[in-house]
From Swiss-Prot:
GO cellular component: cytoplasm
Family classification: Belongs to the endoribonuclease YbeY family.
Subcellular location: Cytoplasm
GO MF term (any one): metalloendopeptidase activity
The keyword Acyltransferase belongs to this UniProt entry's keyword annotation: no
Listed name of the protein: Endoribonuclease YbeY
Xref: Pfam families: YbeY (PF02130)
Lineage of the organism: Bacteria, Pseudomonadati, Pseudomonadota, Gammaproteobacteria, Enterobacterales
Annotated EC: 3.1.-.-
Keyword line: Cytoplasm, Endonuclease, Hydrolase, Metal-binding, Nuclease, Ribosome biogenesis, rRNA processing, Zinc
One of the GO BP terms on file: rRNA processing
Amino-acid positions noted as binding Zn(2+) in the UniProt annotation, renumbered to this chain: 114, 118, 124
Length: 155
């Protein structure tokens, strides 16, 4: 299985307590090589202000969000391994993990898995798409040794 090239950018005011680069690498490697070989992904971990600004600019939503995915569209005739960028908001991940009673590490893993599937073209706008994407997320999270991230919704 090929490995994903990771460009990790830590852009928080305080970067202490974040997952290690090796963890981000493990989470990416659990998703992307199943679908695409020789991939490069940038993960940028940001604070609330940057997440809010990007979410407003690119999605028209005037609030921060947990993860944003920016797939790279390769121009016709070019071959590139760049899959895209994930922007993950530290404070949103921490807040959601606490509110949902999930281990913080598991929620970080879920955000990387979720965002990576978006980079690969998966979405959750329509119900059938959401079911397919959530099933994949659950399968990958279980393979990584974490609980089903949607268990609370299924109970």
């Amino acid at each position: 299985m090929s490995q994903v090239i990771l460009d990790l950018q830590l852009a928080c005011e305080d970067n202490s307590g974040l997952p290690e680069e090796s963890q981000f690498q493990t989470w990416l490697n659990a998703v992307i090589p199943q679908f695409q070989e020789e991939s490069e992904v940038t993960i940028r971990v940001v604070d609330t202000a940057e997440s809010h600004s990007l979410n407003l600019t690119y999605r028209g939503k005037d609030k921060p969000t947990n993860v944003l995915s920016f797939p790279f569209e390769v121009p016709p005739g070019m071959e590139m391994s760049l899959l895209g960028d994930l922007v993950i908001c530290r404070q949103m991940v921490e807040k959601e993990a606490q509110e949902q009673g999930k281990p913080l590490e598991a929620h970080w893993a879920h955000m990387v898995v979720h965002g990576s599937l978006h980079l690969l073209g998966y979405d959750h706008i329509e119900d059938d798409e959401a079911e397919e994407m959530e099933a994949l997320e659950t399968e990958i999270m279980l393979a990584l040794g974490y609980e089903d991230p949607y268990i609370a919704e299924k109970e």
